[in-house]
């Protein structure tokens, strides 16, 4: 028996955005417009039953934002198709969404990782790397990836080293104020790199309801603690 499930592949995300078989243009326009009107840190929850297309919805929003901000690898023809979607012009969203940078984080794919903050940092570093898409890696290699890529990129571009940060993260139960401040400073520099000229960073966190409860709670706690407390009102999730 064949499955009739439409998987959220890049091709399906693009085609359903262009053809709009689900009739979601108005909802997407309203959501994207909302992102441009609320100031400061905020969290938006997209709720729906299993199979209603939440992943499709946020990945289509991600595709639009990345296309407008020229941070994906679409062909010129496909970029033009997205940029000429009627609802973007109707709501004047092309100008409003310029500078609204975003990253996509699959929480379920990372829920066997002890420290969610490392997986999120890996996602952000990948986004920082000159718009290049980094190869997927096994979660057990995330620390090595951050150290290898982060040291090379952030030492050269931002004048900081990730090694002290990794040591902070590896110390179980480390609560020293100095360690916490170092990590806050490091994350703030990453976000500043992703949000030049006072732009905004949007993090789409998907599949949170499929995670282990302990991981979901820890993920939300670390996002609040490390991102919302000290990021200059540039972050939305």
Task: Please report, for each region that a protein language model flagged, where it lies by residue.
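Active-site-proximal structural scaffolding
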Residues: 24, 39, 54, 98, ...
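Conserved Walker B catalytic segment
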Residues: 175-237
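P-loop NTPase nucleotide-binding core
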Residues: 55-196
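Short glycine-/polar-rich loops that comprise or flank the Walker A/P-loop
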Residues: 41, 98-102, 199, 234-236
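Glycine- and acidic
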Residues: 12-17, 168-175, 201-205
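Hydrophobic/aromatic-lined pockets within catalytic cores
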Residues: 36, 66, 125, 129, ...
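Short, flexible loop/turn elements at secondary-structure junctions
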Residues: 8, 48-50, 107-111, 207-215, ...
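Walker A/P-loop-proximal flanking segment of P-loop NTPase domains
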Residues: 1-92, 102-103, 118
């Amino acid at each position: 028996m064949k499955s009739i499930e439409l998987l959220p592949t890049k091709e399906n995300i693009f085609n359903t955005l262009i053809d709009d078989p689900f009739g979601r243009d108005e909802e997407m326009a309203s959501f994207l417009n909302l992102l441009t009107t609320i100031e400061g840190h905020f969290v938006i929850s997209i709720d729906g039953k299993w199979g209603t297309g939440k992943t499709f919805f946020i990945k289509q929003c991600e595709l639009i934002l990345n296309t407008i901000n020229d941070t994906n690898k679409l062909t010129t023809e496909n970029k033009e198709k997205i940029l000429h979607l009627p609802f973007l012009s109707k709501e004047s969203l092309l100008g409003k969404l310029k500078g609204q940078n975003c990253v996509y984080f699959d929480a379920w794919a990372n829920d066997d990782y002890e420290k969610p903050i490392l997986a999120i940092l890996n996602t952000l570093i990948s986004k920082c790397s000159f718009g290049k898409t980094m190869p997927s890696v096994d979660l057990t290699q995330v620390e090595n990836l951050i150290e290898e890529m982060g040291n090379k990129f952030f030492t050269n571009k931002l004048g900081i080293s990730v090694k002290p940060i990794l040591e902070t993260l590896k110390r179980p139960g480390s609560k020293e104020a100095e360690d916490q401040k170092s990590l806050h400073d490091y994350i703030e520099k990453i976000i500043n790199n992703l949000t030049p000229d006072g732009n905004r960073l949007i993090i789409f966190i998907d599949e949170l309801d499929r995670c282990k409860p302990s991981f979901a709670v820890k993920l939300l706690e670390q996002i609040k603690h490390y991102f919302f407390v000290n990021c200059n009102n540039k972050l939305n999730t």
